[in-house]
Amino acid sequence: MANFSPLTVFISVTSLAVFQFLFHVGSSWLSTRLTGGFHKLSARQKIEWNSRTVSSFHALVVGCFCLYILVYDDAVNADPVWGDPFMVKLNVAVTSGYLISDLLLIIYYWKEIGDKYFVTHHLAALYACYYVLGEGMLPYFGNFRLIAEFSTPFVNQRWFFEVLGYSKYSLPNMVNGVLMTISFFIVRIAVIPIYYGRVFSTFGTEAFHRLGLGAQCAWIISSVSLDIMNVMWMIKIAKGCYKVLYHRDGKLTKTQNNGKLE
């Protein structure tokens, strides 16, 4: 039986309200002061711009909190399956509020930013949040997954540069592309052995059996599926980064041989 504490419900609702405010007010207010290009965007682009701004803010908040928990929350680190999930619940509650907020925006602005993949992703993520918030299960693993959010701001920044008219060979775009590739590898690929090392360490334990077959299957299947997608995305991102760097180098060599630089 799910047991959502009043505190986690309050944080989730507050999180939803804050992210709605940031989308409708905060993002536009800040963006107009950071770049004049925001005024030149179409209404459709402004909607996606605000959505991605909120996405980046959420990623930084929960990512930093995730790292803090991984380093300092002894209870969760000592018992990754049933350790005291209080700190993790706070972080996951913030994420739940964001996911619900983003789902509402996707549905309301379906013509502009509607995407069946993101709806499926958000619903699956909320299902995972249920196990942490409602059942107190798998706090370490639920929190560990949030470290992947650190790559999100770089992905969003690539889109910002694109709509602002930056060339893919421009220095800011190339630096961001390299940072995106590196961050994606570190927080989504390099951590895979660490994650599954902790997963395998729980097999056969009393804590693992207490989960029940349903939670066990949901946990393992979702983890493997997510990491398969991460590997596929990593390959695509790495190829794109290599292609841009290789062609940029080729262009510089060609222009230098012609006696001028573009």
From Swiss-Prot:
Domain TLC: 44-246
Sequence intervals crossing the membrane: 6-26, 53-73, 90-110, 122-142, 177-197, 218-238
GO annotations of cellular component type: endoplasmic reticulum; membrane
Keyword Transmembrane: yes
UniProt keyword list: Membrane, Transmembrane, Transmembrane helix
Membrane-topology descriptor: Multi-pass membrane protein
Entry's localization field: Membrane
InterPro entries: TLC-dom, TLCD
Pfam family, one: TRAM_LAG1_CLN8
Example GO BP: lipid homeostasis
Family the entry assigns: Belongs to the TLCD4 family.
Protein name, per record: TLC domain-containing protein 4-B
Naturally occurring in which organism (per UniProt): Xenopus laevis (African clawed frog)
